[in-house]
Regions:
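N-proximal low-complexity "stem/linker" segments adjacent to membrane-targeting elements
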Residues: 1-23
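Short, charged/polar "capping" segments at the starts of alpha-helices
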Residues: 16, 42-48
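Short internal beta-strands
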Residues: 36-40
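GT-A fold catalytic core of metal-dependent nucleotide-sugar glycosyltransferases
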Residues: 100-139
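Conserved catalytic core of nucleotide-sugar-dependent glycosyltransferases
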Residues: 126-202
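A glycosyltransferase accessory/donor-loop signature
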Residues: 193-305
Length: 305
């Protein structure tokens, strides 16, 4: 039987966001086996409270090679931690996070993985069963829209995968909610190692402008077999707030008027005060749903034995 998990890489500065996401996942999502929250090893104690029946906090070291190790926090650069090794130059925490996502998608036991940014919060029910095999996995496809950084990431992905520069259109495959297939992720890793002649993690550590979603999308787009197991879509299932500091009324109105396919919202770029207001709105929503649920089973609806 097909299975699916949720995967969220998260850092210590995102503990509050993790709590908000976990609460929304528990309330609104169904048809997943486990929620894997991946954290740096020395942050395990901070996230231990999130362990549960359907959620496990995973130390990053379980997914990374032993030769890649975090530097002491005192050596952070511009607020970002770095990882070092004797094989490559130091790599940033954001670079390592991209590697962790690929490692999780290939190593975790479930057949498919729904990879979530830590700033994603669900506000509606989301049945994940349509994402299971044998149905094709959705692959978010959007235009690059002339982004220099994304164009560089496209070139890096093509090089790592051994693709010609003219073989792919100028499209992006990124999204705040991504669905990856384990078999596809493993095949992508094999391709990278075959093309580069090195272990895939080392190859990615030696590369610049690496983007995991671009790598995955380029690989799927170029593979007849794996392309057939995916279906392109423009739906991200996630809305963004128009302002950086919306008030409570604006947040309520935005969620209330969301499209039917929008089940989550992104807190990226939101002011801390607005994130607190969003949390309050979702808590009030949960209380209202709890009151409505018992009322749905009225005495008149009960058939006497």
């Amino acid at each position: 039987m097909s299975s699916l998990s949720l995967v969220t890489p998260v850092w210590r500065r995102e503990v509050a966001l993790c709590a908000l996401q976990c609460d929304s996942v528990d309330r609104h999502l169904s048809c997943y086996v486990k929620h894997h929250v991946i954290v740096p090893d020395d942050d395990l104690a901070l996230f231990d409270r999130f362990n549960g029946v359907r959620r496990v906090v995973v130390p990053a070291s379980e997914l990374l090679p032993a030769w890649l190790r975090p530097m002491p926090r005192l050596l952070q650069h511009k607020g970002e931690r770095y990882w070092w090794s004797l094989r490559t130059s130091p790599v940033s925490g954001s670079h390592v996070e991209r590697i962790v996502k690929i490692a999780a998608a290939s190593a975790l036991a479930e057949d498919r993985h729904c990879i979530l940014d830590p700033n994603i919060v669900f506000f509606r029910r989301f049945d994940l069963s349509p994402l299971l095999r044998p149905r094709p996995a959705p692959l978010v496809v959007t235009s690059l829209a002339g982004s220099p950084l994304q164009a560089q990431r496209m070139r890096t992905s093509r090089r790592l995968l051994g693709l010609t520069s003219a073989s792919l259109p100028a499209i992006d495959f990124g999204g705040p909610i991504a669905v990856w297939d384990r078999r596809t992720a493993r095949a992508m890793i094999e391709r990278i190692e075959m093309v580069t002649g090195t272990e895939w993690v080392e190859a990615l550590c030696c590369a610049r402008n690496v983007c995991e979603s671009m790598l995955y999308g380029c690989f799927v787009h170029d593979s007849v077999r794996h392309c057939a197991e995916h279906v392109p879509t423009s739906q991200t299932h996630c809305l963004r707030f128009a302002a950086a500091a919306p008030d409570r009324a604006t947040i309520e109105a935005t969620l209330r008027t969301a499209r039917e396919d929008e089940v989550a919202c992104s807190t990226a770029g939101l002011a801390a005060t607005s994130i607190d207001k969003l949390s309050a709105v979702l808590a009030a929503q949960a209380e209202q749903e709890a009151r409505v649920a018992p009322a749905a089973v009225s005495p008149s609806a009960v058939v006497p034995a």
